[in-house]
Amino acid sequence: MMTDSTCRLFSIAQPSHRTCVHSITRDDLRSSFVTGGEAATTAVPKWAQKTVTLPPQKRGCHLITPLLLKDIEVDLGQFSCGLAHFFLQHTSASLTINENYDSDVLEDVETFLNGTVPEGRRAPWKHTLEGPDDMPAHIKSSMFGCSVSVPITDGQLNLGTWQGIWICEHRDHASARKVVVTMTGT
């Protein structure tokens, strides 16, 4: 049973004109509120999480939206409104959102990264245990990051018309990569 103080605390997240009319129990995943004399029901957010294993990619940037959707579409369809968070579990590749149509953009970004972060004999890096592409891969990964978040609307990722999720592979000889996808919403 929800106490008055718990009810007030829970109501903070709701518009101020709503008043709690009954409590949430463990078996009851909904809380009713009165709005102008009518009862409204607010759903408690759902959660889903899945690890997607991507096949090894050659060095460069690659559009992976279709690969991700193939593995998460059933879970994604359970949400009418929410957020999908994509987290790459690696330090020598990165995730970003960018152009999904013209492959020249993929190549141009790779060209920019290679011109910005030196490799080989001209590079000043100490961390070269796994080869000359090792430390540059870590730096490039830090530049873009290892995660992106995308709104979920009506069971679909709400990306812009020309947006797609990319993996940027910064190693010459990469292995499979794992992306943890966490979805929450109603």
Task: Describe each model-derived feature in a short phrase.
Residues 2-186:
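Active-site histidine-anchored catalytic micro-motif
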